[in-house]
């Protein structure tokens, strides 16, 4: 079995990773780590997340100052850490032949200036930006198999790209009219740290990051076309529902659209394309699926995509990428 560790295990995504990895038949979860300053250091993860009692009763160990020994003892590491932290940790693990699955945005776009503009830090490892493979599992499996650094796609970018890529690949969209993505995420997408915006009495349905959210350039870069993206915070715990509007090329039929989706996802079990009806968050929460449905009228298409932001949008896709990297069935440990 491959020895796996999680750094940043006390957050929502880290806890989901722990739950998935503890029962994985090919990965042995050997350690959970948090920063030395974390208020959760030395606590048992199941004391923080009671749903993990008798499933994952492991301590949240403070990350040691010297990481070489830890990196040498692990075969793969999942970084559920802040972008700047992943930026600093990934090179150490890679230098010690440990495969890195990074759930932050630190290596998703091969452009150092992007990080200065959208993440607020200077990227010091341009060589790793070139080496990193973007972890959109259904579309980049071949490249994922050949890399030791996977930059797992973001939550909004995952559902947005899975919904749009087949139509762009089959040249069905008139991109003179930019696709418009309006997506609503549950409060868990804001992380576990307490803020006024995400507190119980303050949380509401509201747009944020209008025209300046860091996921917009991530989506545009990997789609190969600009988009208009507006994220929203919803007053529910988990899940993302994306409503995507685009213009079809003249004469494009529903059958051509179905064929495009079938061609893309017929052998991809974690994407479910609806024959009728439209996805909902209820259908995907607590699952590793992305569900897609569409309706067309008067030369336009409205696509509805839904996923669990903590699973297909984060932890489950990270494990899916690890499965692919090790030549395993990509759904192993997820279904």
Swiss-Prot record:
EC numbers, comma separated: 1.2.1.38
UniProt pathway annotation: Amino-acid biosynthesis; L-arginine biosynthesis; N(2)-acetyl-L-ornithine from L-glutamate: step 3/4
Gene Ontology biological process terms from the UniProt entry: L-arginine biosynthetic process
Listed SMART domains: Semialdhyde_dh
A GO molecular function held by the record: NAD binding
Superkingdom classification of source: Bacteria
GO cellular component, one term: cytoplasm
Localization (cell): Cytoplasm
Active-site residues, record numbering mapped to chain: 155
Keywords associated with the record: Amino-acid biosynthesis, Arginine biosynthesis, Cytoplasm, NADP, Oxidoreductase
InterPro entries: AGPR_AS (IPR023013), AGPR_type-1 (IPR000706), NAD(P)-bd_dom_sf (IPR036291), NAGSA_dehydrogenase (IPR050085), Semialdehyde_DH_NAD-bd (IPR000534)
Catalyses which reaction(s): N-acetyl-L-glutamate 5-semialdehyde + phosphate + NADP(+) = N-acetyl-L-glutamyl 5-phosphate + NADPH + H(+)
Family, similarity comment: Belongs to the NAGSA dehydrogenase family. Type 1 subfamily.
Function, in words: Catalyzes the NADPH-dependent reduction of N-acetyl-5-glutamyl phosphate to yield N-acetyl-L-glutamate 5-semialdehyde.
Protein name: N-acetyl-gamma-glutamyl-phosphate reductase
Record organism: Pasteurella multocida (strain Pm70)
